[in-house]
Amino acid sequence: MILFPAIDLKDGQCVRLKLGDMDQATVYNPDPAAQARAFEEQGFEWLHVVDLNGAFAGETVNGAAVDAILKATGNPVQLGGGIRTLEHIENWLSHGLARVILGTVAVRDPALVIEACGKFPGRVAVGIDAKGGKVAVEGWAEASELGVIELAKKFEGAGVSAIIYTDIDRDGILTGINWDSTLELANAVSIPVIASGGLASMDDIRRLAAPDAAKLEGAISGRALYDGRIDPKEALALIRAARKA
């Protein structure tokens, strides 16, 4: 079980959105590299980064900020947002990313994801963002008719290192993780699942540490960490205890 602190990048700054709406962005730190260092100093072992502008543009927009983050932290970093081609993937992995997260392209071109997994084993994750049970693409701006589990099953046996599952209806509003849909997905596939969207309090951390959540690889926390609703020291102690159980 891993707790991933999140850095969402918009216009070079560390922000959080409400419900994935770019017009509802709160700036939490104008210096993403400093934020990355702070998370490492707090004891976190990984970092989850999203290029929000890139997700809408279909290509990297906040590259300078990501490079600064990679230089600032010794922790492994996973990046999503605007990564749509093998060239994009190879470029970022050569820059020092631990793994890339493929979202829109996983819907548009599943074969590319499978090819990437073969070329970069263990370094490709799939991001599945859902609204009303259906997969959303293009920075959450478009809905598809594809179901979450239907999409996830396309990558069984392909070598996908993890699925990052985000419930858009809960993202950034501190209402708690959608445990039913998250655990349903985790139990439907053999690929490790990381929960995202809605992590709200220490109660959610305790729920993550419960035995029935053991199938999850971890969870991503953004706003609850920035707002002080989750205490890093206490949360990490609970997560580490769950690993040993």
Curated annotation (Swiss-Prot):
Enzyme Commission number(s) from the entry: 5.3.1.16
Protein name: 1-(5-phosphoribosyl)-5-[(5-phosphoribosylamino)methylideneamino] imidazole-4-carboxamide isomerase
Reactions catalysed, as given in the entry: 1-(5-phospho-beta-D-ribosyl)-5-[(5-phospho-beta-D-ribosylamino)methylideneamino]imidazole-4-carboxamide = 5-[(5-phospho-1-deoxy-D-ribulos-1-ylimino)methylamino]-1-(5-phospho-beta-D-ribosyl)imidazole-4-carboxamide
Family membership: Belongs to the HisA/HisF family.
Compartments, record wording: Cytoplasm
Keywords: Amino-acid biosynthesis, Cytoplasm, Histidine biosynthesis, Isomerase
Record bears the keyword Cytoplasm: yes
Provenance organism: Sinorhizobium fredii (strain NBRC 101917 / NGR234)
Top-rank taxon, per record: Bacteria
Gene: hisA
Sequence intervals crossing the membrane: none
Pfam families: His_biosynth (PF00977)
An individual GO BP term: L-tryptophan biosynthetic process
The keyword Cytoplasm appears for this protein: yes
